[in-house]
Amino acid sequence: MSVCDHQRRWVTLAACLMLWLSGVAFAAKPVRHDVLIDMFIWWNAAYKEKDGFTEAAFGKYFTPDAVLRVNGSDRSKGLADLASHFRDIQARTEMVEIELPFIDEFTSASGDRIFTHHFVKAREKGQASRERVMGYAAIRDGKISMINFVSVPDAAAK
């Protein structure tokens, strides 16, 4: 085997190694987690449990004075109200799921707001629906102090 043949083999081997390593690096990209994603993962699981929505459980993710605002209307204020609000939703629906991963998500430069674009699917009285949700969660001391979302029916779901 000539020197040129050895060089070609090494170049080919090096190129294959580089491609393999780039694939490993891409596949090993860590999944992003923050308090909003962690809360929605918990929320999806809690919805399926009879006593999943408790004040204490919400307290792991929300500040005591947290506000849930949807389409400009305050739906709940405080941990007890959040738990009650979502127990009511749980009681009147057959299924609700926040679709993960989000379509898009980013954190403000100051780190105090997490912006998201995602879907929520549900079934109530046998009728399936899907909402497109956009907005932000305000973060204080590592917890959600406010969720401010705009939610509209997803036209593609019809």
Give the ranges of each region predicted by the language model.
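Short hydrophobic/aromatic-rich beta-strand segments that constitute the beta-sheet cores
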Residues: 68-70, 116, 146-147
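A mature extracytoplasmic/lumenal domain signature
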Residues: 72, 118-120, 151
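A solvent-exposed, acidic/Ser-Thr-rich amphipathic alpha-helical stretch
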Residues: 33, 55-107, 112, 127
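Short beta-strand edge/turn micro-motifs at domain boundaries
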Residues: 130-158
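N-terminal secretory signal peptides that target proteins for export/translocation
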Residues: 1-7
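Short, low-complexity N-terminal intrinsically disordered segments enriched in polar/charged residues
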Residues: 4, 13-64, 158
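Hydrophobic/aromatic beta-strand elements that line small-molecule binding cavities or substrate pockets
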Residues: 86, 100-106, 119-121, 132-138
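Generic short beta-strand segments
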Residues: 65, 117-123
